[in-house]
Amino acid sequence: PTSAPQDVNSIQITIADKQTPLVLLVGPPACGKTMTLIRLARFLKEKGYQLEPVRTLRPSTDKAYLDLCNNFNSMLSTPLAAEATNLISFMLVRVLDKGKVICQILEAPGEHYFNPNDPRSPFPTYLNQVFADRMRKIWTFIVEKDWRDEQNRLDYVQRIRDIQLQIHPRDRALFLFNKIDLTGFVIGRGRVNRAAAKKDVEDNYPGIFEPFRNTHPITSFWKPWRCEFLPFQTGTYTVDNSNGQLYFQAGADDYPAALWQRLLHFIRG
């Protein structure tokens, strides 16, 4: 949105709740982060959870963000895919179950985490602040098959290593293989050859899981990795030829259901 300040280091965000676990969606631009948030949010609403945008994330002068908070629920139900992804640059959503806060989910621009055109750029000040915040974090790294070219993928692996250095032992890490429907690994509705999918990620993003290898002399026998791996699909996207609009049709519930189960497991563990 045009209201975003030009200098990335002047961006201010405030996460006031330092107790509730924070889910971070991490990935390059256009990896489907925003639609992942929307798909999960839709699923949770249907399951009876309450979703609340946190208005204090951005300064009150950011009218675009306040509009976004006001229109959040209607945006969850719109079939127009582009509307959501164009509008959301920042979003902090609290997930509640019968009024009790379960977690908060942060969406921030992908290029602030990793810009393929400037892969070694320092993290913006506000992200360093989030990294340092004391609440438990669940780092959700988004990957996809055949993403850009080899050098971009290697740069992304390096970026994940840089982020991993910020991860506290109490935190949890999850790799989300998005757009799984565009791969050959789906064997049925919501059923995926997960081992083959994970190997494909290892082959195409060499060393991506290495920072998460469990080096503990005992527990590593039954848990070699300190990260989880899940396939994901937001849905299908079709262009209406009459108006050029991109429409979104939610995919199988199995994917957001599995993601939520994993997040709950992390939150409680």
Language model segments and positions:
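Charged, amphipathic alpha-helical linker segments immediately N-terminal to NTP-binding catalytic cores
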Residues: 1-2
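Conserved G1/Walker A P-loop phosphate-binding module
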Residues: 5-83, 100
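Catalytic micro-motifs at enzyme active sites that drive phosphoryl/nucleotidyl and oxygen chemistry
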Residues: 10-13, 78-83, 90-95, 127-129, ...
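Short, flexible loop/turn elements at secondary-structure junctions
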Residues: 27-29, 97, 109-112, 233-236
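Switch II of P-loop NTPase G domains
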Residues: 84-95, 99-136, 147-159
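Conserved GTP-binding G-domain of TRAFAC-class P-loop NTPases and closely related GTPase folds
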Residues: 125-269
